[in-house]
Amino acid sequence: MYKITQLSIFLENKRGNLYNTLDLLAANDINIRALSLADTTEFGILRLVVPDYKKAKEVLESKHYIVKETPVIGAVMDDIPGGIASILKILNDEDIDLEYLYAIAYGGTEKAGLLLHTGDLDELESVLLKHNIPLVPAEIIYNS
């Protein structure tokens, strides 16, 4: 219910690669709800959350992109200074080791969303709910 499928796309560090990838998705009417790009010397990892991840994966793989599906959890927080830190404090106090996180647009201007990934998503979900942190239902992502 709360696990959101993220696509990780491996991109060669080459001029125009990011544009070409995002243009391909746009040309196939695929909207991007969240995006993160991490790079190394030779390649980057583009992480995306889209409403129709199966279609996006199919489109990308048809053009020989390497695409991996990974579940993430979306947490909702107040859009104020310290919003992210308050969630990270809970995770730190509960000994949850995050692998990565990035932002997602959520709830207009008063709320913000944070996509989180860790080795044990069930534990992450349980801890967040125990501390009354609202989670982003996957249906909101997929039905938009």
Residue ranges and their predicted role:
Residues 1-144:
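A conserved regulatory-domain signal marking ACT and ACT-like small-molecule sensing domains
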